[in-house]
Amino acid sequence: MPARRLLLLLTLLLPGLGIFGSTSTVTLPETLLFVSTLDGSLHAVSKRTGSIKWTLKEDPVLQVPTHVEEPAFLPDPNDGSLYTLGSKNNEGLTKLPFTIPELVQASPCRSSDGILYMGKKQDIWYVIDLLTGEKQQTLSSAFADSLCPSTSLLYLGRTEYTITMYDTKTRELRWNATYFDYAASLPEDDVDYKMSHFVSNGDGLVVTVDSESGDVLWIQNYASPVVAFYVWQREGLRKVMHINVAVETLRYLTFMSGEVGRITKWKYPFPKETEAKSKLTPTLYVGKYSTSLYASPSMVHEGVAVVPRGSTLPLLEGPQTDGVTIGDKGECVITPSTDVKFDPGLKSKNKLNYLRNYWLLIGHHETPLSASTKMLERFPNNLPKHRENVIPADSEKKSFEEVINLVDQTSENAPTTVSRDVEEKPAHAPARPEAPVDSMLKDMATIILSTFLLIGWVAFIITYPLSMHQQQQLQHQQFQKELEKIQLLQQQQQQLPFHPPGDTAQDGELLDTSGPYSESSGTSSPSTSPRASNHSLCSGSSASKAGSSPSLEQDDGDEETSVVIVGKISFCPKDVLGHGAEGTIVYRGMFDNRDVAVKRILPECFSFADREVQLLRESDEHPNVIRYFCTEKDRQFQYIAIELCAATLQEYVEQKDFAHLGLEPITLLQQTTSGLAHLHSLNIVHRDLKPHNILISMPNAHGKIKAMISDFGLCKKLAVGRHSFSRRSGVPGTEGWIAPEMLSEDCKENPTYTVDIFSAGCVFYYVISEGSHPFGKSLQRQANILLGACSLDCLHPEKHEDVIARELIEKMIAMDPQKRPSAKHVLKHPFFWSLEKQLQFFQDVSDRIEKESLDGPIVKQLERGGRAVVKMDWRENITVPLQTDLRKFRTYKGGSVRDLLRAMRNKKHHYRELPAEVRETLGSLPDDFVCYFTSRFPHLLAHTYRAMELCSHERLFQPYYFHEPPEPQPPVTPDAL
């Protein structure tokens, strides 16, 4: 069970009754009690006096949706347990057999009803000043923030568990929650710990009692429900047990123990004693924090109203508390029942499926049964299993529905409940005698079955000779057709535009190959029919105009190979390069003695093929867009001849032995972006950019390869003056690479070309990380995209190249489409700069700000946040020879970005005058020189580039920044004057 969050710290009252010695002037962690509350506070309080020393405020323990869907999930802030309300069987409240941390550990997993579970676990360390509670440092896998060091430090670990449920049927987010927990060891039976803590549900009232004498040590109210207590040991925090009781019960017991405000003795038995178990009843408390519901186990006495199991709305008023409860001001009050009604207006506003029962009583419910849930098809091996609620490992073939319904063990007198989906049968049930009616029905069924069998045999004997005769006639007709085909090929063999070398094929060879080929005509180009054989061959433009050019097979002398020829296009059906959507097949073929790829398209996709051809004709003038050659048609298919490529980007990245032939990843991404910018300049949105649709060309005459964008089947041509397209025709693209605005119902504006930028950003990370995706594994990607849950962990936060890449990719995959750069902006980014251009940029910036005032906007922007860029003092992070040389001529400020750039410029200008030792440490110009500084200050280039955007319009910086040209204004006519 994962460690629970640290909530409220209990203060100790009544110093005369304290069990500790005198207060020390030095606060040691062993003298503190740590109390964690639902609102995210961690209070450090004195064990003896109960006074709060300090409070650490963090995010709430639970973060759940504000709406309630069906079924509703109620988490337990104490340990992350889950309860459901409003299931299909209307069972009321039920307890699920797993917690949020366990689900995160088991994810990714999928339920039998189509729910995808995605989990995320993130750890963070807080370094706390023990005296003040101030955070000195925050450590995580992504960042590390620090303040001034302190001598007394406390290290607290906190874990964030995030679980997301995505419904594949409705394509909607089902539920998500975040649960926080502090790292602590589990509670133990510690004889040295002499205190018992009683916590009220629904508020922050805590009563701390001496567990041996029964003396009440102190009472404190923390204004938020308490979820955990901790003490400090040498190895860290250790959780301390506490008892959740009803507010009425706690106030009732304290009232019975003495005068208000002067409680001296706890007269009620402790839960450890058997007497207490008979007087306190376990229940489940349903509470409301902020706008969300939660559930927590609670003990109540006989006077507290409890909602019966399976009910959500009481039919009669509950019983009143026998004793008198005490209000905050000391007056006697009757604790009112509390209920909440969900606003029906939210149902139409948010389009949610609300609960069948709109009323849910907030208060104490009878302990619910454990759910026979279909959340998981099977428990993964890494999910902690309990013997009483999991199918044994040797029965994997059984479905999850066969798991017996779980019965809550907290109430000994609770009746055994059978699942509504699965009926339990006794192990040795006596056999039921067979009724006469059942026997008669069986006899009638036997007679009917025998009659049908007899009729079937008679029909078979009569029809078999006739069917054999028809089959022989059909075979004879097929034989005649094959002979006609051979004669046609022999007559027209000299007219074929493509004739492989070798002797003329023999009749028998063609006959042998045509049989099996015609059988596979569903996935290959068909043979010429007798009707098509009467037409003469057409080629070139005439074939396209006629629209019915016949396709012919020609044998090249190999028994297993045949060639299909349609106009100027020819290909071998057995040489398949790949398969596309809607039955499209890509073959290796020939066009005008050139190797090409031939796409064979089905008739139902002809309109899409025509649009693709039109877009290819418009866009193939760019070297990084696939080249189009020709299109042909026959009676059944359409064929498109395009440039033949060597591989896809996926093979380039994932095949370690792939020959890159000098095509570096950054160059490949630059070429891809250049092709995308060309498409966007033609108002073409690709809408399906992914590694499979980015191809690697065949080596040219110089042995070089390049990247090209292909597959224009889902492209959209925007009309002149339009910058967006409608989503009414569906959601194009491949799952896991689709921009969030394409699927989000909250997006009111139509998508634009930025959907391609989002996909390109994912491709960038895929290439740089050598196969990873910024939104996780394939099963989780689209759900994470909708949630904006990305991770760029493969990019090192202190490596210059990775810092530049992160800065660009984060912009490209931004959730807000308007924050994404255009393709031309991306091409101007420093990610694509050579080392020489980086050094030139630093020099130009230094020249520009040399005479700029320190109070000027440019210098202020450059120095804002600059101390982190130069690591507080850049002079201490360079080599000693360079430090010594810099001190000879002028004074530089170690905390100034401006002075660092000035030093780089001066040493570059006077490089040949530098001492040999300094030149050796700086390296050669320009590559080694600029790497010397960027390796020591990895954020320098990104920071300087962002700061100097103020001057991007100046002529000096035009090579480094992109500006959209102003839209042309309509000419002014004399009539308008």
Curated annotation (Swiss-Prot):
Topological domain (Cytoplasmic) residues are 465-977
User: Which GO terms fall under biological process for this protein?
Assistant: cellular response to glucose stimulus; cellular response to hydrogen peroxide; cellular response to unfolded protein; cellular response to vascular endothelial growth factor stimulus; endothelial cell proliferation; insulin metabolic process; intrinsic apoptotic signaling pathway in response to endoplasmic reticulum stress; IRE1-mediated unfolded protein response
In the UniProt entry, which residues are flagged as the active site? D688 (proton acceptor)
> Residue ranges, Lumenal compartment?
19-443
User: Which terms are listed as keywords in the entry?
Assistant: ADP-ribosylation, Apoptosis, ATP-binding, Disulfide bond, Endoplasmic reticulum, Glycoprotein, Hydrolase, Kinase, Magnesium, Membrane, Metal-binding, Multifunctional enzyme, Nucleotide-binding, Phosphoprotein, Serine/threonine-protein kinase, Signal, Transcription, Transcription regulation, Transferase, Transmembrane, Transmembrane helix, Unfolded protein response
EC number(s) from the headed UniProt entry: 2.7.11.1, 3.1.26.-
Q: What is this protein called?
A: Serine/threonine-protein kinase/endoribonuclease IRE1
Which residues belong to any copy of the KEN domain? 835-963
Q: Which SUPFAM superfamilies does the record match to this protein? A: Protein kinase-like (PK-like), Quinoprotein alcohol dehydrogenase-like
Q: In which tissues is it expressed?
A: Ubiquitously expressed. High levels observed in pancreatic tissue.
Give residues where Phosphothreonine occurs: T973
Q: Which residues bind ATP?
A: 577-585, 599, 643-645, 690-693, 711
Signal peptide feature range: 1-18
Site-annotated residues for Interacts with hydroxy-aryl-aldehyde inhibitors? Y892
> Where would you say this protein principally sits, based on its record?
endoplasmic reticulum
Topology with respect to the bilayer:
Single-pass type I membrane protein
